[in-house]
């Protein structure tokens, strides 16, 4: 690849006697949407956690956008995640007592932005995801698809280099799932954000540019994906 944003080399990771990763090499191209697939217990979540700097591998290296994450302390990795990485989870993990605007603004406030600037950017991202009329509502008053779009806006408001999406539509019905995936991929492709998408669902993976499959701690394939 001409311009990889993530280069992982020789990753191993064990939890007690269990080898979760057994020497994985992987590159992710800048602006690519990569689907990481695999059965439960295959090591796919451990791989992605290493790529995102959430955990350190036992051996090997991860270079993200020019920074060797494996050479950093936990506090330094946390700073990189705040500034350059976005996360979307299956159940959104929004704060229920905050409005949509406040949820989206939170990462900017944590990074030291003023309340006014953070709210302005939060509202702009809600608008981009078709949620301008939900800005003052709490997550509990929204549909599941709307709440997940708020979570996507929160993940993208800092303009991360890489978005890690862990089963982002796993809790939604098929119609909502397609709507949310379509909205997410539209905005990330416009902004050039790289996406690493963890999924067990082939239809979700079909939205990606490429798929890799993790089995027993090893990569078993890398395939171009054709949207359904």
Features from the language model and the residues they span:
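H-loop (His-switch) and adjacent beta-strand-loop-beta switch element
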Residues: 211-223
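ABC family nucleotide-binding domain
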Residues: 4-214
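ABC-family P-loop ATPase nucleotide-binding domain
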Residues: 1-12, 220-228
């Amino acid at each position: 690849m001409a311009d990889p944003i993530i280069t992982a080399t020789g990753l191993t990771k064990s939890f007690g006697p269990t080898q979760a990763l057994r020497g994985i090499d992987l590159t992710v191209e800048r602006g690519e949407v990569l689907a990481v697939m695999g059965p439960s217990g295959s090591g796919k979540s451990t791989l992605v956690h290493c790529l995102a700097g959430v955990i350190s591998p036992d051996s090997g290296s991860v270079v993200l956008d020019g920074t060797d994450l494996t050479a950093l302390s936990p506090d330094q990795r946390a700073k990189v995640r705040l500034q350059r990485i976005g996360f979307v989870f299956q159940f959104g993990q929004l704060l229920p007592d905050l409005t949509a605007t406040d949820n989206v603004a939170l990462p900017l406030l944590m990074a030291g932005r003023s309340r006014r600037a953070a709210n302005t950017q939060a509202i702009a991202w809600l608008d981009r995801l078709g949620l301008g009329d939900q800005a003052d509502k709490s997550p509990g008053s929204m549909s599941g698809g709307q709440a997940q779009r708020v979570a996507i806006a929160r993940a993208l408001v800092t303009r991360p280099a890489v978005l890690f999406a862990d089963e982002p539509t796993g809790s939604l019905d098929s119609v909502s799932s397609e709507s949310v995936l379509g909205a997410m991929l539209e905005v990330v492709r416009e902004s050039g954000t790289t996406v690493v998408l963890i999924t067990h669902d082939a239809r979700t993976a079909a939205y990606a540019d490429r798929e890799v499959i993790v089995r027993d701690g090893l990569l078993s394939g890398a395939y171009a994906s054709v949207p359904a």
